[in-house]
Amino acid sequence: MAATASQAHASSAGATCLRNTTTRGGGDDDAFFPCDDDDDEMDGRDYLTSVLSDDHVPQELRAYYESFRELRDQRLWYQLTLQVESFLRHPASQERPRHIDLYEHFIRTFARHINHLVLASMGVIVSRQYEHAADALAFLQRLATETDQPETQDAHVLLSMEAAHFQLLLGDLSSTRAAMDRCAKLLDSFDAVEPVVHASFYRVCGNYHKAKAEYADYYRNYFLFLACIHVDAEMSKAEQVQCAHDLSISALLGDTIYNFGELLLHPILASLQGSEYAWLADLLFAFNAGDMGRFEALLPRLASEPMLQAHVPFLRQKLCLMALIESLFHRSMYDRT
């Protein structure tokens, strides 16, 4: 069954990336599209006229389209950018392919006047409306190619990593890995970069390692991702629960993770309370305390998590080692040898 683009973005928060961009308006230096001309302006007007003549357009969106026309005519690019961002967030605009049409027939006509990273972020949001992941991938790859210029490398990294997300969804692990390696080198070359770019990078890297069951690498990358976003503002409750679940499983199965303090202290773990995974938090605390009795009491719950159930011997061994570490830690310094 072909994956949809909306499914691909069910967990990405980072993809809600219109925040963390310091400048909404742009100048010629910010452009990664050819300069708009009279034909572009006319095309944009024709599109808006066509939309406003459509009786099926929701009433709550008509004010947006009317303001688009007015602000475009007055060349108030900053205000127009803000209106477009608001439109893309509006629940009534989520019907497919409203975002795609707006981007292709209107946003592109004044793209040179938008900050390149804001424009790229708009493209990421638009990609969610493609019905098939392959179409979303082609769209983002086109934008990534257009931004592969010295002055727009941060936007190029953002778009490349979001394209890599769809490559991962389509099972193309080698292309995903290639994008990760290339973008890592680009990020290392930057003096500074907006959090939205790092968030996209770490999120996709984390999901790549999750797909390969590389627990420690997933754990490390997803904590870096969480550090780049406002969790409550950018992740739904369901996304937070899934993230806390995945981090918990990775902490338990990671063969180099013997300290759960970072996870136990992170607000994301509280999302498990009241969920079907609440017992995972209890299990983490049992491991962190080296509490074998608590582990045995929770052992029947592992049947609901096949990955944990398949690694019970490893978990016992890990708990014994963590219990030893806990015991040594609490011994007085005079008793240690």
Placement of each model-derived feature along the sequence:
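Alpha-helical scaffold segments of alpha-solenoid architecture
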Residues: 212-337
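Short coil/turn linker motifs that delimit alpha-helical repeat modules in TPR/alpha-solenoid proteins
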Residues: 151-152, 192-194, 234-236, 312
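Amphipathic alpha-helical segments of tetratricopeptide repeats
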Residues: 141-148, 181-189, 224-233
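"A position-specific structural signal for the A-helix of alpha-solenoid helical repeats
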Residues: 162, 166-169, 197-211, 246, ...
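TPR-repeat structural position
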Residues: 130-133, 173, 215
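Eukaryote-biased activation of long, low-complexity terminal tails and linkers
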Residues: 2-139, 160
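Start-of-helix signal in alpha-solenoid helical-repeat scaffolds, especially tetratricopeptide repeats
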Residues: 100, 114-120, 154-159, 197-200, ...
